[in-house]
Regions:
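Glycine-/Pro-rich loop/turn segments that contact NAD(P) or position catalytic residues
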Residues: 1-44
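Glycine/proline-rich active-site loop of Rossmann-fold NAD(P)-dependent oxidoreductases
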Residues: 34-41, 72-81, 104-106
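A short C-terminal helix-loop "cap" of Rossmann-like NAD(P)-dependent dehydrogenase/epimerase domains
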Residues: 42-52
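Substrate-positioning beta->alpha
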Residues: 52-74, 79
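Substrate-binding strand-loop-helix patch
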Residues: 57-64, 83-101, 114-118, 153
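Hydrophobic "lid"/C-terminal helical patch
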Residues: 67-74, 95-98, 155, 162
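Terminal hydrophobic/aromatic helix or amphipathic segment near a protein terminus
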Residues: 93-142
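Amphipathic terminal alpha-helices
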Residues: 140-170
C-alpha cells in the first residue's frame, strides 16, 4: 500500500511533521464507518459488490470514537497511534451484516481481482485522481486493515442508525 500515491502523500506530511520541530501527534485509523455506509446502501438496494473475495480483515472506527482517540492522543504521551473499532471482521462479513440490518437476502457479487486491476488501469487513463482512488480501493481489498481496538461503537450499531434514517426518509 506504500506504493500508492495517496499513501505517499500522507507519509510526506508525516515526514514533514517529524522534521518540523513542532509538538505533533499522528493518528492512523484503520478505516472509517462512513466508508462502510456504501455497504448498507448496496444491501438496501438488494445487491452488494466486493472487490476480491472479501476475506481480508478490518476494524473500522466510528468518527465519534476517532474524535475521542484524537483528544486522548493530543493529551497523552504517545506520538503515533493506530485506531480501530471494536469489531474485527472480513469485508464479506461486513457486507453480510449490512444485508442483515437492511432485512434483505444476501446477494454479493465478487469482482475478481484481475478484473478490478484492469479497471483501475482504464480509470487511470481517464483520470489520474480517480485512478489513484480506484487503486487504493482495490489494494485495500487485498490487505488486512486491523489496528488496536480503541473505539466502542459497533459497526452493527452504525448500520442500524443508517437503516433507521433510511426508513424515516421514505
Amino acid at each position: 500500500i506504500m506504493d500508492l500515491a495517496i499513501t505517499q502523500a500522507h507519509e510526506r506530511v508525516v515526514s514533514d511533521l517529524r522534521q518540523s520541530g513542532l509538538n505533533y501527534r499522528i493518528v492512523r485509523p484503520c478505516g472509517y464507518f462512513s466508508d462502510m455506509g456504501v455497504l448498507y446502501d448496496m444491501a438496501a438496494k438488494g445487491r452488494s459488490f466486493l472487490v476480491g473475495p472479501g476475506h481480508n480483515k478490518m476494524n473500522p472506527i466510528h468518527g465519534r470514537d476517532l474524535a475521542e482517540v484524537c483528544v486522548d492522543t493530543a493529551e497523552g504521551d504517545e506520538v503515533e497511534v493506530e485506531a480501530g473499532g471494536p469489531d474485527i471482521m472480513t469485508q464479506r462479513e461486513a457486507a453480510e451484516l449490512a444485508f442483515e440490518v437492511a432485512g434483505k437476502p444476501i446477494k454479493i457479487t465478487v469482482i475478481p481481482m484481475w478484473l478490478a486491476r484492469g479497471l483501475v488501469k482504464l480509470i487511470a487513463l481517464l483520470s489520474t485522481q480517480f485512478g489513484d482512488l480506484a487503486n487504493f480501493i482495490v489494494t485495500a481489498g487485498e490487505i488486512d486493515g486491523v489496528g488496536p481496538k480503541r473505539g466502542t461503537t459497533t459497526l452493527k450499531h452504525y448500520l442500524e442508525s443508517l437503516h433507521a434514517a433510511n426508513r424515516k426518509n421514505r
